[in-house]
Amino acid sequence: MGRGLLRGLWPLHIVLWTRIASTIPPHVPKSVNSDLMAGDNSGAVKLPQLCKFCDVTLSTCDNQKSCMSNCSVTSICEKPQEVCVAVWRKNDKNITLETVCHDPKFTYHGFTLEDATSPTCVMKEKKRAGETFFMCSCNTEECNDYIIFNEEYTTSSPDLLLVIIQVTGVSLLPPLGIAIAVIAIFYCYRVHRQQKLSPSWESSKPRKLMDFSDNCAIILEDDRSDISSTCANNINHNTELLPIELDTLVGKGRFAEVYKAKLKQNTSEQFETVAVKIFPYEEYSSWKTEKDIFSDINLKHENILQFLTAEERKTEMGKQYWLITAFHAKGNLQEYLTRHVISWEDLRKLGSSLARGIAHLHSDHTPCGRPKMPIVHRDLKSSNILVKNDLTCCLCDFGLSLRLDPTLSVDDLANSGQVGTARYMAPEVLESRMNLENMESFKQTDVYSMALVLWEMTSRCNAVGEVKDYEPPFGSKVREHPCVESMKDNVLRDRGRPEIPSFWLNHQGIQIVCETLTECWDHDPEARLTAQCVAERFSELEHPDRLSGRSCSQEKIPEDGSLNTTK
């Protein structure tokens, strides 16, 4: 029946599409026509846009009438809300054209995307020093391929609209029927397969896709994380909440409580373990800050806590705000160091993964080169770092974090306040003398805090010899929960830092770690290393044969991490 329908409709397709081809004016690009053919899709699920994506390329396009981008790369935008953007620049040296996807909620090159709902890319001039600068945005398929500088070139043939309306219904019937059939077959297969699964089979195979309710699908990966999600970095807007059963309280902080919980399936008693961070009604702002940070899809990284979704819930205790994330059974780093002495290899893995996570947080691009908003944590400490099953770190607790949006004014940054935990505050934060003109100074406060955490790790490493009981940075020099004034006396007046015993330096790898953390807690923020530099240094520690040039000692670190004194 399906084949007969296709055969019957095919001649009509040829006739109608021939009419379309004959009525398209030469100046109307493919992207505009594609949008017209889409019809009115209000009420349908919004799919990611298809845009030209060539970043910055040299162009011969002038700014008089209109032109094509000549970009050969078409990309599906990562997020449904992203639109197509084109940027045309002319300076004394050349003309360049940039085509990308971008979320209109955020500025691009410091400008708001005011025309993000336009079906065509009509250039508007922006004021920029030293160059002629035009930018446009639009929300139809590949609409940034056809760049318009004069709005009279945006008109299209009235006959074209009528023809396209006629052909749309006929064109969509065959693929729609095929799609429904494929979905039905796949659904039946999934239901049949799920019913046949047994616990013994599950325990002997790699963990696969598991469906639950209509909210989202969860992909269970390897032992590096207990859970990850295809709908990660999203807030759950569905009226039906995720089927979660709270288990035990595993942590409590200033703003929220953290529970171990069971995420149940619809059709069985099986469940997966997740963590649920619950904020009371009065801590809405902290929940919103952390939710907004997690909702940035470019934040995803193996050394940043895996986010599942965020929910608003009504309980007998009143309204609550939930963040649902991966659960890591080893707990936070402070707890882990209190209970365990670590080896040199453990220290290298923990330190390296911590630096990589912070470097990604601070970076203005993803590892694959996509633009990303830099973020500063502002409350880095060992209790805000989780230990994964493979003994690597992941950052969590972003309730005090700050997005370094270039559109923020100095006043906006000044109003962000003196935040963090006093024991881990950098000197300039304690003294409230941050350089608000330079956003890099915010990142360097995180680097200072990271140095203290690296010291904590090193103090519990058996490669240095005698290992004392765990103590936080500054140990008994300050009380258990020191105030800002107490830390000012220690850090500013006395220029105090945690002690590095001389025998730690007998191990070549530990010596490099100590040199690194000493440079990271320098009193001068501009003299500190960047998180990326620290990550690179730890990467070098994976190759002991390359370390001789970094130390006075000519001895090498063998695979077991001990100091090799063999000549």
Curated annotation (Swiss-Prot):
Q: Which residues get modified to Phosphoserine?
A: 409, 548, 553
Residues of the signal sequence? 1-23
Disulfide connectivity for this sequence is 51-84, 54-71, 61-67, 77-101, 121-136, 138-143
- Cofactor dependence: Mg(2+); Mn(2+)
Q: Per the UniProt entry, what are the Gene Ontology biological process annotations, in alphabetical order?
A: activin receptor signaling pathway; animal organ morphogenesis; animal organ regeneration; aorta morphogenesis; aortic valve morphogenesis; apoptotic process; artery morphogenesis; atrioventricular valve morphogenesis
What is the annotated role of this protein in its UniProt record? Answer: Transmembrane serine/threonine kinase forming with the TGF-beta type I serine/threonine kinase receptor, TGFBR1, the non-promiscuous receptor for the TGF-beta cytokines TGFB1, TGFB2 and TGFB3. Transduces the TGFB1, TGFB2 and TGFB3 signal from the cell surface to the cytoplasm and is thus regulating a plethora of physiological and pathological processes including cell cycle arrest in epithelial and hematopoietic cells, control of mesenchymal cell proliferation and differentiation, wound healing, extracellular matrix production, immunosuppression and carcinogenesis.
What is known about its subunit structure? Homodimer. Heterohexamer; TGFB1, TGFB2 and TGFB3 homodimeric ligands assemble a functional receptor composed of two TGFBR1 and TGFBR2 heterodimers to form a ligand-receptor heterohexamer. The respective affinity of TGFRB1 and TGFRB2 for the ligands may modulate the kinetics of assembly of the receptor and may explain the different biological activities of TGFB1, TGFB2 and TGFB3. Component of a complex composed of TSC22D1 (via N-terminus), TGFBR1 and TGFBR2; the interaction between TSC22D1 and TGFBR1 is inhibited by SMAD7 and promoted by TGFB1. Interacts with DAXX. Interacts with DYNLT4.
What protein name does the entry list?
A: TGF-beta receptor type-2
